[in-house]
Amino acid sequence: MSDIPSDLHYTAEHEWIRRSGDDTVRVGITDYAQSALGDVVFVQLPVIGTAVTAGETFGEVESTKSVSDLYAPISGKVSEVNSDLDGTPQLVNSDPYGAGWLLDIQVDSSDVAALESALTTLLDAEAYRGTLTE
């Protein structure tokens, strides 16, 4: 069974979300997603400062099996990207919830309540696990 940490939020598209600051979240793909993809060979991420919209694509993960779109779990601005993935994209496979993170998204600091609201619309670990068995 895939590793599904209970302290994260999830999307049905297999992204995980961790609150990393008052107005910032860190985003990655789940253990299930990296396992289904196989060996990751390239990750395309937006540049810092790019606006992303919840539910819309922000990049791609390319593996030896396929290319998969990445979807923003919340709307905001890219505040950081994991530049380590440029040289070692396989971090997504070896440590999807740690060193293999993708990017940080920052919401408007004057609207932190919107971040709280957005997080409540995401799946918790139990609900995400349920999507994998359907």
Swiss-Prot record:
Cofactor(s) essential for the protein: (R)-lipoate
InterPro entries: 2-oxoA_DH_lipoyl-BS (IPR003016), Biotin_lipoyl (IPR000089), GCV_H (IPR002930), GCV_H/Fam206 (IPR033753), GCV_H_sub (IPR017453), Single_hybrid_motif (IPR011053)
One Pfam family of this chain: GCV_H
Disulfide bridge positions per record: none
Cofactor binding annotation: Binds 1 lipoyl cofactor covalently.
Source domain of life: Bacteria
Keywords, alphabetical: Acetylation, Lipoyl
Residue stretches making up the Lipoyl-binding domain: 24-106
Annotated GO CC locations: cytosol; glycine cleavage complex
Signal peptide bounds: none
Keyword match Ribonucleoprotein: no
CDD domains documented for this protein: GCS_H (cd06848)
UniProt-listed GO biological process terms: glycine decarboxylation via glycine cleavage system
PTM-bearing positions, type N-acetylserine: 2
Job of this protein: The glycine cleavage system catalyzes the degradation of glycine. The H protein shuttles the methylamine group of glycine from the P protein to the T protein.
NCBIfam families, sorted: gcvH, PRK01202.1
Assembly behavior: The glycine cleavage system is composed of four proteins: P, T, L and H.
UniProt name for this protein: Glycine cleavage system H protein
Organism in which the protein naturally occurs: Mycobacterium tuberculosis (strain ATCC 25618 / H37Rv)
Protein encoded by which gene: gcvH
